């Protein structure tokens, strides 16, 4: 593998072309690959999106299980290998494109991927920032630190809170760096994402809820009653605390998704619209 790394030195590369530069680390453990596909629990009825297909170690197994496989890869050399490996699988389409520039399938789809670590958060935002999309579930291998941030009981990031209102996110297990080529500097984790059957809020409230989440989580370590006093009156906050069954010291980052649903519903029902916090506007092309 070292010889392969050497050939990229001093060479000008497009985004995602080299595993080392893109943060892409290819899996080579067959048992691990089979475990990932098994845990994804896919069937002939599923459309599977693979982001960062690499040389096709995962793609070829997915092609035998799914009804349709959309394998995205930006490295021209890998695309050639993928094309040869999947030539006998008519259900598999190779998409030669930057992951962040693709259009997600309009139909319901599943994601099974070993994603490039360098763009972990942008990929998650692409998949989860629109709860009305066709994304249903996924098994994603990512950097362990990112996996822990996305699944922590203490929530610091507004986008993570928004994701978890509509999706369950959990770590299946950790994966040693020795299962990858080139091996990353950090360990990895297998993460399961599942759309909630009974989400606490309708997806039509996503933008309004994101505004509340961004406002509240600017200071996740302070008490909720202090952070939200710009929205609720003292009397409203008193009733809200009773509804949430919390004391005055309960901090913003420790609330559950169901508690956030109560806060949001209370705001929309009893607070004048002009007092609702607004979500930050995204720049063109920003996720």
Curated annotation (Swiss-Prot):
Sorted UniProt keywords: Antibiotic resistance, Methyltransferase, RNA-binding, S-adenosyl-L-methionine, Transferase
Amino acid composition bias (Basic residues), ranges on this chain: 1-13
UniProt protein name: rRNA adenine N-6-methyltransferase
GO molecular function term, any single one: RNA binding
Stretches of the chain forming a coiled coil according to its record: none
PANTHER family: DIMETHYLADENOSINE TRANSFERASE, DIMETHYLADENOSINE TRANSFERASE-RELATED
Top enzyme category: transferase
Organism field: Bacillus anthracis
EC numbers on record: 2.1.1.-
InterPro entries tied to this protein: KsgA/Erm (IPR001737), rRNA_Ade_diMease-like_C (IPR023165), rRNA_Ade_Mease_Trfase_CS (IPR020596), rRNA_Ade_methylase_Trfase_N (IPR020598), SAM-dependent_MTases_sf (IPR029063)
Family: Belongs to the class I-like SAM-binding methyltransferase superfamily. rRNA adenine N(6)-methyltransferase family.
A Pfam entry, by short name: RrnaAD
UniProt keyword Transmembrane helix present: no
A biological process from GO: response to antibiotic
